[in-house]
Amino acid sequence: MTHNFPLIRALPLLLGMLFAGPALADKADPVGEVSTAFKLVGPNHKILVEAFDDPKIAGVACYLARPKTGGVKGGLGLAEDPSHASLSCHQTGPITLPAKLKAGEEVFDVSTSLVFKEQKVVRFYDEKRNALVYLTYSTKLVDGSYKSAVSAVPIMPWG
C-alpha cells in the first residue's frame, strides 16, 4: 500500500522558494565592503555598500550601507543581520515626476534574516520643498522603535 504525501513531495520546492526569495528581492549593485570583525570560521562580519536606482523615477540613485553578519551562520545565510543602515540618495540625471506618486511607496528591500526581517527603502515627495525623500528602516522592532535613516534629493534642473 502506497501513501500519497503531497507535502513531502512539495517540501523541496517550498524550501527552494524560502531560500531563493531573499536573493530575488535584492536588486542592488554591490559597490564595496569593509571587513569589521575577523571570524576564524566562516566569512568575517562586514559592512556592505550597495547602490540601486529608483525603479519609477529615472535620475535618482541611492547608496545603502548595512552590516552583514559573518561566521558559520552568516556564511550559511542563517544569521540575522543587525537592524541599522545608512542611506544617501542623489540626482544622477534629469528627473521627471510621474503624474501620480504614491506616498511611502517601496523602492527597495533586502532580506536581513532567514525569515521575516527586511531592510526597506520607501519614497515620499515633498511638494513644498520640491524634493524626493527616501527613508530606510528595518522591519524588526529594536528597543521600542524601528532603526531608520533618511535622505532627501532636491529636484534640480539638469544639464
What are these regions, as identified by a protein language model?
Residues 20-22:
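N-terminal signal peptide c-region/cleavage motif recognized by signal peptidases
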Residues 51-53, 125, 138:
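Short, low-complexity Ser/Thr-rich regulatory SLiMs
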Residues 128-159:
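C-terminal partner/receptor-binding element of secreted or periplasmic proteins
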